[in-house]
Amino acid sequence: FIRPDVMYVFQRVLEGNGLLISEDGGRRVDANPWFRLIATANTCGQGDETGMYMGARPQSMATLDRFENWVSVDYMKPKKETAWLKGVVPMLSDDMASQMISYAGEHRVAFVDGKIMQPLSPRGLRAMAKRFVSTMTLVDNEANALAEAFGSTILDRCTSQDKVVLEGLYQRINK
């Protein structure tokens, strides 16, 4: 989320009063009727209690009150995420994309249930898929390429406790 001292500039705009530019003699710039200000935040402006989003900045309640609509966005549905993954990594086979999406779903459930501390974002999934495709040029089969991609993009960055859980999920899905 934005730095509070920068967000202050937008308070008048969010209240429908236009932008006041004090450096230009107090000139007021009215917003176009179709103007919208959209903000995204992993922490809903509350800061980060988990330590996972260290750059998250808590926002004042006065600032948060100026945003009238809040939308929670979940991960894509498996079918849509599979299509997306195939779109960003076209060399990925349908079966492998489906297998990776199944793993991602299980990984995310484990995260939500508090079994692991490491989430799996679409960026992380894309990294695993890209690593798999590039590794396929170096190894003799898909199983070895997938194990390498999983290890280097997922396992190598997580805690030892998470590794145990994630390796179990991986083994169950990739029998």
Labelled PLM ranges:
Residues 1-175:
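C-terminal regulatory/interaction module of P-loop NTP-utilizing enzymes
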